[in-house]
């Protein structure tokens, strides 16, 4: 299984997060860099661990949290959907298991503050 720590060190993913943050900064949004995605990732993992979810689900929550705003690279509007599509590609190319991809992509695609719903434990 692909790990959260492996993703954090991935140069391609780091580039997308950096550029998404730059785009949002140019539009006047608050910080969405590594501090933000790391905080979301760690918080999601902590919540699931505290609630007694499996270590696998905790890891998937960390991964989803880390990638959740990557769609801001494309545009802030509908960033959860574009982020889910981007995450699918990134995870698939890293040989992530299909069931893990499905869980992560569903969580990312449903995280938008205006329309998101917790469709699974990772979301």
Give each language-model segment a name.
Residues 1-15, 23:
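Non-catalytic interface/linker regions that flank or bridge core catalytic/transmembrane domains
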Residues 3, 23, 33, 41, ...:
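Generic serine detector
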Residues 7, 27, 31-34, 77, ...:
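Charge-dense, low-complexity intrinsically disordered segments
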Residues 11-18, 56-59:
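N-terminal glycine-rich anion-binding loops that anchor highly charged ligand groups
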Residues 14-49, 66-73:
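Active-site flanking loop/helix segments enriched in acidic
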Residues 51-123:
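Divalent metal-dependent catalytic cores for phosphoryl transfer on phosphate-bearing substrates
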């Amino acid at each position: 299984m692909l790990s959260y720590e492996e993703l954090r060190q991935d140069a391609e993913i780091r580039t997308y997060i950096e550029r998404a943050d730059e785009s949002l900064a140019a539009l006047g949004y608050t910080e969405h860099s590594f501090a933000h995605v790391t905080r979301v990732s760690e918080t999601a993992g902590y919540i699931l661990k505290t609630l007694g979810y499996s270590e696998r689900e905790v890891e998937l929550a960390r991964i989803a949290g880390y990638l959740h705003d990557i769609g801001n690279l494309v545009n802030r509007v509908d960033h959860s959907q574009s982020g889910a599509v981007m995450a699918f590609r990134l995870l698939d190319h890293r040989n992530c298991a299909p069931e893990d991809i499905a869980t992560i992509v569903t969580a990312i695609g449903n995280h938008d503050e205006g329309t998101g719903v917790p469709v699974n434990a990772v979301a």
